[in-house]
């Protein structure tokens, strides 16, 4: 049954700061995540997206049954490149009626020559992997957020059912990844049952060495064996640190000691304001290398002598306990970090540890700093006297804002406040539109209207930081109410004039409030 439906793979690439040129939305009484309002000449149009398409997969992850904002989030976090598997509207509706397994659609498609450089999600960005990569997963809620599968005609075990925003996805695991190692042990020739057992025995944390679908195909065609020494460590949440120090009048300002609990040489008793403290050395750091040479197998006196031979400056490769535990679990020496970073022996280049992907951030711009400055979505149902607020604008300036919110009126009950700046009306950005157009859009809406607004302080903050204000930053609205429930007859719009501004008594709304509409 599934073979009669032909989904399309569309690869979209945009410039930094620009959009993909389409809206992703859900509509009342309509199934699926819909593609709408495709801009002419946009990346969306060039990639072949069509109005009414339903998005089945994003970067290989099946999303048809996921919450809409999670789907929007996946697109946003893909950076400047995203791959969508879509099905045209008519086919989608027929498939739903025939109860076709949408998850199976497109899975047998082999990538074309043009697909060789398809981008893959990596911690919210886009990156093409041509080398194996190491991923570290820690269970959340008793789950890693993936399943394992075997593929007919191919050896090995592969990753599937990657849960959107789950542990595996955040760790950098991709759909159809070939699993090479589990906790440093090669599993290329292991059975499905053996691999499952190894993962279970690992407990609440596990490391995988993986190759993506394209890389795996390349290795298979060229009969190249995957080499663990070529692995990328970039996805690990903790990394070794290269620390450079210049000796002060009282030396470096730390003690080097052997630990009965941990094999190797441990940093202890760092003096305040010493070269060691200023360089970022921490108590209980384990010394892996001195001036580019591994000291993991050396005794205490030998390591001390190597530091002394460095003269008035030294470069240490160190790991904290968490980093050491991750590398040990994966069966890698932290010294491998030198090769992976292409640092020459003896390098004193300071390499900052990468920051793990944010867990609950809805778009790349919404950081913790923005937390107190988020916009809000307000859904207003027209009352007997309209919406209960006035819309104002300063002459000669773009943008409209809220004034005179009537206590107990629809606007007040929806959370609208004086000085709130209107960002969107029913999903359409109105920031650069004239006052008249904003008024007209509200008036032509119907019985309810959904506004994305931003308080003056928050608006000024976003403008200063040049952060675009989008609906995914706001808390989601509850399910739509019945627009006819409790409806009162509306009054005619009442316009007023003030010396410095125009304002209009707001009325009306539109059935578009029965959708979530996000510009991509």
From Swiss-Prot:
Entry's localization field: Membrane; Cell membrane
Keywords from the UniProt entry: Cell membrane, Membrane, Phosphoprotein, Repeat
Gene3D superfamilies: 2.30.42.10
Sites bearing Phosphoserine, chain numbering: 108, 147, 191, 249, 333, 347, 491, 509, 511-513, 515
CDD domains (alphabetical): PDZ_NHERF-like
Superkingdom, natural source: Eukaryota
Biased composition (Low complexity): 506-520
Keyword S-adenosyl-L-methionine: no
GO molecular function: protein-membrane adaptor activity; signaling receptor binding
GO annotation, cellular component aspect: apical plasma membrane; brush border membrane; plasma membrane
Membrane topology note: Peripheral membrane protein
Annotated GO biological process: positive regulation of protein targeting to membrane; protein localization to plasma membrane; regulation of monoatomic anion transport
Pfam families assigned: PDZ
Region (Disordered): 352-373, 472-520
Modified residues (Phosphothreonine): 450
InterPro entries assigned: NHER, PDZ, PDZ_sf
PDZ domain: residues covered: 9-90, 133-214, 242-322, 377-457
Domain-related comment: The PDZ 2 and 3 domains seem to be involved in the interaction with SLC26A3.
Job description of the protein: A scaffold protein that connects plasma membrane proteins and regulatory components, regulating their surface expression in epithelial cells apical domains. May be involved in the coordination of a diverse range of regulatory processes for ion transport and second messenger cascades. In complex with NHERF1, may cluster proteins that are functionally dependent in a mutual fashion and modulate the trafficking and the activity of the associated membrane proteins. May play a role in the cellular mechanisms associated with multidrug resistance through its interaction with ABCC2 and PDZK1IP1.
Stated family: Belongs to the NHER family.
Subunit field text: Interacts with PDZK1IP1 and ABCC2. Binds to the C-terminal region of SLC26A3. Interacts (via PDZ domains 1 and 3) with SCARB1 (C-terminal domain). Forms a heterodimeric complex with NHERF1. Interacts with AKAP2, BCR, CFTR, SLCO1A1, SLC22A12, SLC22A4, SLC22A5, NHERF2 and SLC17A1. Component of a complex, composed of PDZK1, SYNGAP1, KLHL17 and NMDA receptors. Interacts (via PDZ1 domain) directly with KLHL17; the interaction is important for integrity of actin cytoskeleton structures in neurons. Interacts (via C-terminal PDZ domain) with SLC26A6 (via C-terminal domain).
Protein name per its UniProtKB record: Na(+)/H(+) exchange regulatory cofactor NHE-RF3
